[in-house]
Amino acid sequence: MNKIRKWLDKIPWYTDEIHSILMYLIMGGFTTLINIVTFWLCTYVLNWDYRIANTIAWVASVLFAYFSNKKYVFESYTPTWKERAREVTSFFGFRFLTYLVDILVMILLIEVLSINELWAKIWTNVIVLVLNYVFSKWIIFKVKK
């Protein structure tokens, strides 16, 4: 990753902010892929209820997201247990909040608007992706000056 970053840093308009957004889109893409594939497997292969499948997909993707966001997106350094505990609890707390948005939007799209489960999942992921970036950037992994 460092070799790529060094190469990208040679581009005059490539800033830390652009790097953070680009890395969030890449890692967010992987997180979304994990979420959708897990949801699809649980719903269409295992034939589980979409709410259970959504919860399992959420757990799998949030675990991946924490480590990828910490290391590659926000390059967060937490030297003390207290800082690490604050970061972990705020990350999972805000992700739980967006999980509630996720499940409520899924229910609305599927049961009220009769949208296909997989399409509902994809649209819901767009909403959740934006909310998670805002929470991560300005609250969870906020750089102290």
UniProtKB/Swiss-Prot annotation:
<comment type="function">
    <text>Involved in the decoration of cell wall teichoic acid with galactose and glucose.</text>
</comment>
<dbReference type="Pfam" id="PF04138">
    <property type="entry name" value="GtrA_DPMS_TM"/>
</dbReference>
<feature type="transmembrane region" description="Helical">
    <location>
        <begin position="96"/>
        <end position="116"/>
    </location>
</feature>
<keyword id="KW-0813">Transport</keyword>
<protein>
    <recommendedName>
        <fullName>Cell wall teichoic acid glycosylation protein GtcA</fullName>
    </recommendedName>
</protein>
<keyword id="KW-1003">Cell membrane</keyword>
<comment type="similarity">
    <text>Belongs to the GtrA family.</text>
</comment>
<dbReference type="InterPro" id="IPR051401">
    <property type="entry name" value="GtrA_CellWall_Glycosyl"/>
</dbReference>
<keyword id="KW-0472">Membrane</keyword>
<dbReference type="GO" id="GO:0005886">
    <property type="term" value="C:plasma membrane"/>
</dbReference>
<feature type="transmembrane region" description="Helical">
    <location>
        <begin position="121"/>
        <end position="141"/>
    </location>
</feature>
<dbReference type="InterPro" id="IPR007267">
    <property type="entry name" value="GtrA_DPMS_TM"/>
</dbReference>
<feature type="transmembrane region" description="Helical">
    <location>
        <begin position="52"/>
        <end position="69"/>
    </location>
</feature>
<keyword id="KW-0812">Transmembrane</keyword>
<feature type="transmembrane region" description="Helical">
    <location>
        <begin position="21"/>
        <end position="41"/>
    </location>
</feature>
<dbReference type="GO" id="GO:0000271">
    <property type="term" value="P:polysaccharide biosynthetic process"/>
</dbReference>
<keyword id="KW-1133">Transmembrane helix</keyword>
